[in-house]
Amino acid sequence: GRADWEKGEIKLYCNQVFVSDSIKEVVPRYLLPLRGVIDSPDIPLNVSRSALQTDRRVRSIGNFVAKKVSDRLRNLKKEDPKGYAEAWDALAPFVKIGAMEDEKFAEQVSELILFATTAAAREREDGDPIACDGRAFTTLEGYRSRLAADQKKRVLYSTDDVAQAGALNL
């Protein structure tokens, strides 16, 4: 089902005692669609929004969750690049929003963000580009590594790759 952005689908516990299911103050906004349980002795039993927002221990839980998400995405891409590319359309909005909102998360996922490419999907040592369902995906670093020495270092971004296909194949 759809994630409830207001309520969240992560339950907070302190030493196995239910505290809250209002997690907006604990995890970053871009991770609210996650489902699960956080059980930590660092979560205060007396929960108020202002207490959660100002508690340094609670903020560190949000950073920890973001780090675990980026680690899991990195492992998925490394272990199953094609599976990662297949899931990318569903993951992309959250990863990209997270990268825009959280500088630390952006550094953690910079090599995990995929872009569609017109490059032929031929297997290289680094596995770039990744072929998936007739499409090819690359990372920004993968694109840069394929540039010829005499080629200008430029990156083309398209908002509508079908309508702009002629220009992109230049």
Q: Where are the regions that the model predicts?
A:
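Conserved GHKL (Bergerat-fold) ATPase module
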Residues: 1-170
